[in-house]
Amino acid sequence: MAITIGTQAQTLFPSKGAKNVCVDTHLVLTFTGDAPQTTNHGMVRVFEVQSGACIDSLDLSIPAGPTASRTYGPECDYTKLPYDYHRTSIPTNRTVRPGTPSGGALPTYTTPADYQLNIIGGFTDAFHFYPIITRGNTATIYLHNNVLEYGKEYRIAIDSDVFENFEGTDNWTFTTKASAPDGQTLRVNPGGTADFCTVQGALDAIPDFSTTPYIINIAEGDYEELVYARNKSNLRIKGAGMEKTRVHYANCEVFNPHPLNLKTNEYPGTFPSRRAAFMLDNCQDIIMEDIRVETTMQGQAEGLLVNGERIALRKVHIIGSGDAMQGNGTIYMEQCEMDGGGDSFLGRGSIFLYRCNLRNDGGPFTWVRNTQGHHGDVFVECTFSTTNGRKVDFGRSPSNKGKTYPHAEQVMISCKTAECIPEGWSAIGEPTTFFAEYNTRDLSTGQPVDTSKRHRYARQLDGQKDKTLIKQYSTPSYVLGGWNPQF
């Protein structure tokens, strides 16, 4: 449906009068020329036609989120309080005020509102988000998650001052699908021809801790959305290919920081981080494959955050900044690609990577923080290289503001490297750690690398003397607490 607003012809999605619309749809306006600039003024409102009630509104005068780092007081420290993941129902923007605190945190909301807030995946502390994103000739309006319901007609009203040279509209209507899908295979397509338009919409449709296996098939396309999955299990998330299905968002620690009164990312099972583009939190028995997940923000900004057990990734391309991926739990990765900055891989769990390619722009690839009784990061037949010729290193495990990691473990078996420092590792804080390698070769020549100047706490494994140890660390089930990943 094409209409004229201001001086530019515009196409609406969903089209005016459309039926069978996904309940997680975005509102997309496509112009003949570049999309007009947003003005940081005006309102977007959604009305339920039958009742006349306004069921959602976006105030464009409220900034999306912070653009500068917070200042924290001395009372803000890493919490050791176990986070309570139990819930009898999934909170949404329709039932709970966004910013309602959990896990001992202070409220995220303020009165009047400092920033936009959106409950995603039932996380009531909420996320800052961009209510409108423009790309080229397209403007996408992001409603609050889970405000639309099945089998209802809605009317969209957009004030004239939301965009420059815009006359506004208040007669854009559409009707959602009659009911939710009833099968265990859910389809996602951004064009609205499947069960859901977004990855998050499909995740929200799956019960917590499901004992029934589910599959989410994500069609080829570009999905610009912040994804947070909590309490999911027995789930396969499958895209159309690493470079065909792209899920991305501009998120980082500055934009979605930890609460004012507590820090995150130190003790497993405590208050979750909100800074990644794609988050699997308190999840078990998940397979992700044939997909690209990416943060487009700089700083402490993971493309993927995993808190969970028995999480398997195959042919997943992860792109981030500092800490490109954070992994806590038991994680298996095969034929994956990773691009990031220093500390590309931050982890407190047991992680086994097989035939993966890791690239960064200089500095350490890992910061290993596994605890006693758990294996750390193990790389088998992986490659390590740099994108700009700067020197890289395998990783580090220094003290962190007084905290040390005496049981940190990183093992490299038959890996290939380029532009790696002679020491291999840049910082190993304790002699009790286990940082070892076997058969490391040059990525370009295939020849063995010179290990004569390796870090004093690093260990070279011998093919004969350490034969059993090498075999053990080459076996996923040994590293992952008995779990043998299957795709």
What are these regions (language model features)?
Residues 177-193, 197-487:
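Sequence-level preference for short, compositionally simple segments enriched
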Residues 5-180:
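Acidic, low-complexity Ser/Thr/Gly/Pro-rich repeat segments typical of extracellular/periplasmic
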